[in-house]
Regions:
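Catalytic alpha/beta active-site cores
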Residues: 1-243, 247-251, 257, 442, ...
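Catalytic-core signal marking the mid-to-C-terminal active-site face
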Residues: 2-27, 47-52, 339-486
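Generic structural signal for well-ordered, non-membrane alpha-helical segments
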Residues: 75, 79, 124-131, 155, ...
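Structural signal for hydrophobic packing residues in well-ordered secondary-structure cores
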Residues: 83-87, 138-142, 163-166, 170, ...
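Flexible, glycine/charged-enriched surface loops at secondary-structure junctions
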Residues: 89-90, 208-210, 278-286, 323, ...
């Protein structure tokens, strides 16, 4: 394995860059110097990281949607609507699925079909197909900072074009945009691809341009125990920092139990800072993002607003720097811009109401946070051991050994032995720990928590609990109880 968690040399980077820029015609004449020069013209109020840092200092929680359509003018119209009618503090450009798979020719077909039909035939904005100038038109046409949000195992060309195009934040990571999204991508390959992305961001940083980087916290978004997502976030933060990234936002997807959600965010902040400092990255600016519920939603819009508001409440009580907002159309598919704006306003109402409240030092939160820390430390110590001190190599071996195991992930790399279920209060525990390197005390803790639920429901701890929990929120509950349970 050639993989190492070491900063790419300039020779290695620029040799690879020639190949990357040649993969689609919009990369052909792309100039790194021009991209840096253009980024330097973007004022502080349009810089993603600066707005996050200000919010963190003021202990505010900013709102951000997901959004993206095929045609530039329609995309601009959508973003403008979300920042005016939706009152979004931060804006996205969600990238289409063809771009995520580097199938740019099919993206071109989608653009043409969108023009013919008068509606978006792509599920996002095809930034690579359009190239730098149109990206600059998009980012300069709105008032707020814009982030690239996608799901791309190999995002090298996308990074090149969007950074030169004026986007000031880039989401994703080698693990979080592989394991939950892809079946066949080798982890060592996505590791090297994302080292390129992070090294490019590092080069902008070294030239005086700070680009925010955000690993994708929720992973599969389905009953992911906090220790798994937190461990992945720390590894991806370390890998980004090694390549020169100095502005990182670590994230987490809502599980639904308020104590556990606040504790997860608390422990994530502590652990990310601890590991960055330990490896000499004390100059990395660290912020957080909380994703509202990523699982099944109720079809009824009024009930969906309840789920959205609960996510906003958890985010602000955990003092997350920003919250990624859902819409009341979540159960139906891609929302209208009006529905997207409604989800944003509902979230804004809650974050504004609760902005002066802080649950992070609540005694129950601290206890749960300590448990999550212990679990994450078990995983990270094993990863470090497997990699002989190298977290990139260790992550590859860690997945192979099941020391990191993401529930319900499609990837062949993922062992899939660790299985989650909710305890009697709705916190996510492990019904099967698989090969996770937990202590006996931690294994006992999870077993006892689930046995407590089983006693309440008068049934054994079994796989049916998992199935019931997956569908519960869509049916109006957090814990998937059998009918007749009091």
């Amino acid at each position: 394995m050639d993989l190492q968690n070491k900063k790419m040399t300039e020779d290695a980077f620029f040799a690879q860059r020639k190949e990357v820029l040649a993969t689609w015609h919009t990369g052909k004449d792309l100039s790194l110097e021009d991209g840096i020069a253009y980024q330097k013209t973007i004022t502080g109020d349009k810089r993603f990281g600066e707005k996050l840092q200000k919010a963190a200092a003021e202990r505010q929680t900013l709102t951000q949607p997901r959004a993206g359509v095929a045609l530039p003018e329609e995309h601009i119209k959508l973003l403008r609507f979300l920042e005016t009618e939706g009152e979004a503090d931060l804006l996205p450009s969600t990238i289409d699925s063809y771009t995520r798979l580097n199938r740019y020719a099919e993206g071109d077909v989608g653009i043409e079909k969108s023009k013919e039909t008068g509606r978006s035939m792509l599920n996002g904005f095809p930034a690579v197909n359009y190239g730098v100038e149109i990206c600059r038109h998009v980012t300069s046409s709105v008032k707020n900072p814009v982030q690239v949000r996608h799901g791309t195992p190999d995002a090298r060309l996308l990074t090149e074009i969007t950074l030169a195009g004026g986007f000031t934040s880039f989401e994703g990571g080698a693990i979080s945009y592989n394991i939950p999204y892809s079946k066949n991508h080798a982890l060592e390959h996505t590791m090297t691809h994302w080292q390129y992305t992070d090294r490019l961001v590092g080069m902008y940083q070294e030239a005086g341009v700070s680009i925010n980087r955000e690993p994708f916290g929720p992973l599969t978004g389905t009953l992911v125990p906090p220790c798994i997502s937190n461990a992945v976030a720390v590894i991806e933060a370390l890998m980004a920092a090694e390549q020169g990234v100095r502005d990182i936002t670590v994230g987490y997807g809502q599980c639904g139990n308020l104590i556990q959600d606040v504790a997860a965010m608390r422990s994530l902040r502590i652990l990310a800072r601890r590991y960055l400092d330990r490896f000499g990255f004390k100059d990395v600016k660290l912020t957080t993002v909380f994703h509202q519920w990523m699982g099944g939603f109720p079809q009824d819009e009024a009930r969906a607003f309840g789920v959205i508001s609960w996510g906003a409440a958890a985010a602000v009580l955990a003092k997350s720097t920003k919250v990624i907002c859902k819409s009341p159309h979540e159960a139906m598919g891609i929302p209208t811009m009006e529905a997207n704006a409604q989800g944003l306003r509902a979230s804004k109402q809650v974050t504004s109401m609760l902005k002066d409240q802080d649950m992070t030092e609540n005694p129950l939160v601290v206890i749960e946070s300590d448990i999550i820390e212990q679990e994450v430390e078990c995983i990270l110590k094993k990863v470090e051991e497997l990699g002989k001190g190298d977290f990139a190599v260790g992550a590859v071996h860690g997945f192979a050994a099941g020391a990191i195991d993401v529930p319900f992930a499609p990837s062949r790399v993922n062992m899939g032995k660790a299985m989650p279920a909710r305890d009697n209060e709705g916190a996510i525990r492990f019904i099967e720990v698989g090969n996770l390197p937990f202590t006996d005390d931690l294994k006992k803790f999870h077993r006892e928590k689930l046995e407590e639920r089983a006693k309440t429901e008068n049934r054994p701890v079994n796989f049916q609990m998992i199935i019931d929990d997956v569908y519960a929120i869509g049916k109006g509950f957090l814990v998937g109880r059998p009918e007749g349970t009091k």
